[in-house]
Amino acid sequence: MPRSSFSGSLSSPKLDVVIDMGNPFLNLTVDGFLKIGAVAATRSVAEDTFHIIRKGSISSNDFEKSLKKMCKEGAYWGAIAGVYVGMEYGVERIRGTRDWKNAMFGGAVTGALVSAASNNKKDKIAVDAITGAAIATAAEFINYLT
């Protein structure tokens, strides 16, 4: 009986930039900042490009606004990633073990810090800390599955 099959593979390009700050904590924090900051900046550019194409024209004001938004988003999300990675690494060093609890604690502290920096009230800070912990823990569990 004749059979046909299809096979293929998909691999993503990988780019690693290493900046040696002389301290593993700083190395991981800067790495997280740069990687997530670049993703946020790229997302911002893609979103603004979509809106410009939809509008049908571009002005120097649109370009300047897009560039400012790209830098702002990259710095914001990069800083959040840097705090999270730094907290997770710090907890790992203190506890002496690497597991999902480090991610949970890092996510909780990062969520609380971001919320407090946004001048939210105590209840909202607590909810954001729980959300940060839940997201970080879920991401860690998903990484264990793959």
UniProtKB/Swiss-Prot annotation:
The record's keywords, sorted A to Z, are: Chloroplast, Ion transport, Membrane, Plastid, Plastid outer membrane, Porin, Transmembrane, Transmembrane beta strand, Transmembrane helix, Transport
- Membrane association type: Multi-pass membrane protein
Q: Which GO terms describe its molecular function?
A: amino acid transmembrane transporter activity; porin activity; protein homodimerization activity
- Mainly resides where? plastid
Result after altering C71S = Loss of CuCl(2) sensitivity of the channel
Any transmembrane segments, and where? 75-91, 103-119, 128-146
Gene Ontology, cellular component aspect:
chloroplast outer membrane; etioplast membrane; pore complex
Q: Which GO terms describe its biological process?
A: monoatomic ion transport; protein import into chloroplast stroma
Where do the record's region annotations for Contains 4 beta strands lie?
1-73
List where in the cell it is found: Plastid, Chloroplast outer membrane; Plastid, Etioplast membrane
Q: How does it assemble?
A: Homodimer and oligomers in membrane.
Q: What biological function has been recorded for the protein in this entry?
A: Voltage-dependent high-conductance channel with a slight cation-selectivity; selective for amino acids but excludes triosephosphates or uncharged sugars. Non-essential amino acid-selective channel protein and translocation pore for NADPH:protochlorophyllide oxidoreductase A (PORA) and possibly PORB.
Q: Which family does it belong to?
A: Belongs to the Tim17/Tim22/Tim23 family. Plastid outer envelope porin OEP16 (TC 1.B.30) subfamily.
> What is the official name of this protein in its record?
Outer envelope pore protein 16, chloroplastic
Name the gene that codes for it.
OEP16
